[in-house]
Structures are given as C-alpha cells and as structure tokens.
C-alpha cells in the first residue's frame, strides 16, 4: 500500500484574462476566421511549408495533446491564444484539437509581432508567456515522482475547481485517464475507496463534490 502523503500542490498564477483580451483586441485588427470543419479538427500553428501563425480562441475551447503520447495536456478555454512563442520545436510538441462550436481566428506570427511593437504590448506578452510557462511547470510537477494516489487527488482538486456545469458533464475517470494514462483498475480502486470513506461524492461517474479533506496517506 502506497504511504506517500498527498502533496501540498502549488497552483499556477490565475489566468490573466485582461492581458489576454488586450492582446486579442490588437491581433483582431489583422486576423481572419479559421474554418473548423468538425469536432476534434486539428488546428496547426506551424503548417507545413507555411509561416507560423497565432491562433485566437474567441469562444469555446481547444484541447491540447502531447504529440509523443497523445496525452491530453489541457483544455484551453476562451479567451486564449497560442503561437506567440514562435518556436517550431515547441509548436510541434503539441497538437491542438478544436471542440465543437469553437470560434477561432488566426493571423501570421510575423504580423502579430508587428502589432505587439506598434501597440507597445511587450509587458502583456511577457505576462502571458509567464502564465503559460508556470502552467506547464505545474502540469509537469503533477506527474513527476508522484504516486497514483497523489495524482488522482490532484486531478480531483482540478475537477472541483471547474465551473459546476462543466464538472457535471465530465467523467472523473476519463478526465484523469486522458491527462495521465494511468491504469483504469488503479484509478477506480482509489475512487471507490474515497467514496466509501465519504470523502467524495460521485454520481453517474461525475464529481459532485469533495466532502472533506482527502487523507494525507493511502
């Protein structure tokens, strides 16, 4: 039985919505709608034999997956934008897939850089890039040198922080599995034990609430 304690998780800075909206407003002076043909359509930041581009998420969300192992990294909801790193290597590490109903616009990376200079938005870009870097470090920290129990608890906390309408549409197991690829048997055993101990309330596979502080050890 695993005896590692649940870690005191450090959460990243809050999403800088005002900063993101400022950048989107500037970029929309040169952006064009991006046609989304179907749910889970792949959105390329670095199209083959074409200039890199910046993607603006105006409504809905993109799901971001690691290319190497198809692990879902995060659901990025509007308002949001991606591609300002300008790095082909980083762009190719992830695959961006649109959700049904997502409203996206795009502009060339070079034009986005020009607009940043024209509108003196260097601080906004730096603040947003800091947020992205912090979130990436937070996600990585969840999975490195952690036990299955610690990881399950961390993603239960993430689910708890979701808006209720989104949380009650989200399968607890699917959410954990998509982000971790942990074995079903291990995850379900932990969830069952936490339910029996009346630590969590799960109905129809969805998290209703965390009822009390989760045990430090399992």
Language-model features, listed with the residues they occupy:
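Cyclic nucleotide-binding regulatory module and flanking cytosolic helices
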Residues: 1-43, 50-51, 81-82, 87
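Inter-domain helical "communication" segments and dimerization helices
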Residues: 3-14, 28, 36, 106, ...
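Short beta-strand segments in beta-sandwich/barrel cores
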Residues: 34, 43-44, 60-66, 103-104
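Glycine- and acidic-residue-biased ligand/ion/polar-headgroup-sensing regions
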Residues: 50-69, 77-80
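Surface loops and adjacent helix of pleckstrin homology
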Residues: 67-69, 87, 107-109, 205, ...
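Cyclic-nucleotide recognition modules
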Residues: 72-129
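Polybasic "coupling" helices that flank or enter modular domains
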Residues: 123-182
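Phosphate-/nucleic-acid-contacting segments
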Residues: 159-218
């Amino acid at each position: 039985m695993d005896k590692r304690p649940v870690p005191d998780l450090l959460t990243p800075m809050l999403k800088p919505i005002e900063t993101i909206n400022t950048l989107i407003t500037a970029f929309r002076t040169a952006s064009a709608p991006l046609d989304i043909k179907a749910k889970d359509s792949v959105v390329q930041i670095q199209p083959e034999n074409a200039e890199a581009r910046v993607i603006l998420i105006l409504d809905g969300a993109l799901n971001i997956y690691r290319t190497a192992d198809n692990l879902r990294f995060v659901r990025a909801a509007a308002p949001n934008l991606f591609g300002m790193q300008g790095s082909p290597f980083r762009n190719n590490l992830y695959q961006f897939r649109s959700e049904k109903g997502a409203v996206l616009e795009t502009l060339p990376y070079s034009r986005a850089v020009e607009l940043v200079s024209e509108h003196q938005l260097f601080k906004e870009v730096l603040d947003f890039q800091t947020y992205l870097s912090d979130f990436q470090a937070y996600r990585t920290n969840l999975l490195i040198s952690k036990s299955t129990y610690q990881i399950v608890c961390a993603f239960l906390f993430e689910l708890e922080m979701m808006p209720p309408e989104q949380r009650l549409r989200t399968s607890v197991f699917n959410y954990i599995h998509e982000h971790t690829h942990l074995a079903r048997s291990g995850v379900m055993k932990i969830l069952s034990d936490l339910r029996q101990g009346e630590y969590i309330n799960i109905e129809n596979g969805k998290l209703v609430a965390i009822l009390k502080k989760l045990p430090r050890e399992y």
